[in-house]
């Protein structure tokens, strides 16, 4: 009963998706809606997986400790030399990788964001605490449903801030404690230099005379406010001016003036009313305008007594000292008393707690025999067996569990056991790092753009193109060994012909581990690569010379001058053939038959397909170039209009390219200058030629000539 009772201030799990981890929230309010349901106003906490990798790197940098220590040689001479180092927490170094991985799941990031969620989505309680530097990190792992935080995340600004002020540690910031003095022993310090006297208790004035002087000081303050224009606007009535003049700042200034004038009342009154006019003393309550006071109350309602955030977001033109001073003066006003009574009345009417029964509905991600398709006969599973059957748990690699849950992308067919599924829902990660972790580095990806036209366009969907999805497989040594040791189980040729069938990687890994000791005794014989001799390569290059370079593109004027009527000739389209053996223009036009016959046929009602055409120098319209002027009209039989010709067929778009640099290519890249690198990027079809001076290291300078003869200086 008590476990299902949730109160204001509890940290709870919320479920917003059946496959995603729970949300961690703190209940601020419990409100009852008009239809009778209960909504919880909660404070959001974010996991590491919810924020960007850049902010995660900043959080890890914040977690490093700054160690300060004294240098040995300088301490003897009375000189303090301090060296600051950044080093990792020694306790984190001692933790194994598995515990480090699980400890990251316990870290949260507090936010100031509030949201309202249905109370029926609560799935349990948890505990969240501020990171305690004196506690052991293992203590957070030993307690169930326990989390910690140290930074504040702003989801709007995408920033991280420290939740508490940092205390500087070291000899430069801490005082040196002296030895305890014996009874009657003096410390030898001059107290007059260390302290400033502001009031004499044994003064010649009586209490009645001091009270009368303070009444005169209040009167002077009221008269000064009547003369001040800004004060008369803020305190339009005499009653308000007298109340403002009776505040502490006026009385403290009067007593300080009396002390400076050696408790002579006549001199003190003369100091309160100098020649320029009466002295006006105002505190923060008078300095702040009504709009600033309303902003402060709004900020206090949102942030509480977090004065740093109040200054940054609401009152950046006010100092932190001014805000704190105004807060304590504001607590003495009637406005504060009224708001306190209203909040108490609202709290009485609101819900204090709510009972949520256990959630017993089955999860849609559960894997059962009834909701899966039968396995393929030629696949790894038997007939009637689920495609994921035989797979180990992606987290703990177990093959036995009373309940399995699908996890990850559907095409991966990954699954988790019951205990790892509960861990995933609560902590937002797996017990062990997996292949789906986003922290692992991947290959650099480059999308090629043909002729400068982007393959993926964010404009009209008519011009948008999408290439076939590419992938990159980077195998490990154990995978390459398993291909040879477990060939009869893996059946690589069969798997290559049927890439959609799953492979039982757990069974292959176990079999490879068992056969590995025997295979080490008889080393594998690798097939040697047969390389042709240099003479054969040279002979081939002589018989197959490089084709000549194309002529440079002529200007439009030369094209106009050379346009002459010619007979009809077949048009050769440079588009690449598609899967069905047709060119891209054939798919656009939808015309079959012989190319020569189509050109001699009548237009058949198709637009821009006239028989008469002018032949000139061959020049294609570039995709990224400028079109011909509007006066020049080039009509080509059996071709497309220029606007339609610029559109690329998605089948003709190139596949993605993965470039894996080697040590040799990295060395060559360092030899190129910045201009040569940019030139090669602009013209990728041209070979890069290295000069001999670039390839060879610079020669050392020649030695200076040595002259054995003495130098004679004549007068």
From Swiss-Prot:
This is Metastasis-associated protein MTA1. It is found in: Nucleus. Transcriptional coregulator which can act as both a transcriptional corepressor and coactivator. Acts as a component of the histone deacetylase NuRD complex which participates in the remodeling of chromatin. In the NuRD complex, regulates transcription of its targets by modifying the acetylation status of the target chromatin and cofactor accessibility to the target DNA. In conjunction with other components of NuRD, acts as a transcriptional corepressor of BRCA1, ESR1, TFF1 and CDKN1A. Acts as a transcriptional coactivator of BCAS3, and SUMO2, independent of the NuRD complex. Widely expressed. High expression in brain, liver, kidney, and cardiac muscle, ovaries, adrenal glands and virgin mammary glands. Higher in tumors than in adjacent normal tissue from the same individual. Up-regulated in a wide variety of cancers including breast, liver, ovarian, and colorectal cancer and its expression levels are closely correlated with tumor aggressiveness and metastasis. Residues 283-335 form the SANT domain. A motif (SH3-binding) lies at residues 545-552, 696-705. Disulfide bonds: none annotated. Signal peptide: none annotated. Component of the nucleosome remodeling and deacetylase (NuRD) repressor complex, composed of core proteins MTA1, MTA2, MTA3, RBBP4, RBBP7, HDAC1, HDAC2, MBD2, MBD3, and peripherally associated proteins CDK2AP1, CDK2AP2, GATAD2A, GATAD2B, CHD3, CHD4 and CHD5. The exact stoichiometry of the NuRD complex is unknown, and some subunits such as MBD2 and MBD3, GATAD2A and GATAD2B, and CHD3, CHD4 and CHD5 define mutually exclusive NuRD complexes. Interacts with RBBP4; the interaction is direct. Interacts with BMAL1. Interacts with CLOCK. Interacts with COP1. Interacts with CSNK1G2 in the cytoplasm. GO terms for biological process: chromatin remodeling; circadian regulation of gene expression; double-strand break repair; entrainment of circadian clock by photoperiod; locomotor rhythm; negative regulation of DNA-templated transcription; negative regulation of gene expression, epigenetic; negative regulation of transcription by RNA polymerase II. There is a cross-link at residues 182, 626 (Glycyl lysine isopeptide (Lys-Gly) (interchain with G-Cter in ubiquitin)). It holds the Pfam family MTA_R1. It is linked to Involved in the epigenetic regulation of ESR1 expression in breast cancer in a TFAP2C, IFI16 and HDAC4/5/6-dependent manner. Residues 1-164 form the BAH domain. PROSITE patterns: BAH, ELM2, SANT. The modification N6-acetyllysine is found at residue 626.
